[in-house]
Amino acid sequence: DVCESVAGRCIHNGCWCERSAPHGNCCNTSGCTARWWCPGTKWD
């Protein structure tokens, strides 16, 4: 699914995501778009 914005970051399935996170999701208004994904988020 699409990430929900929380305090300027995105969180999904208990995983915080930041654009600067080397192994996290890059989140934007369209949802999660990144080469690397947090565990359990890639197919949501």
UniProtKB/Swiss-Prot annotation:
Modified residues (6'-bromotryptophan): 16, 36-37, 43
Subcellular location: Secreted
GO cellular component: extracellular region
Keyword Magnesium among record annotations: no
Annotated positions of the 4-hydroxyproline modification: 22, 39
Full protein name: Mu-conotoxin-like Cal 12.1.2f
Claim: Disulfide bond is one of the keywords in the record: yes
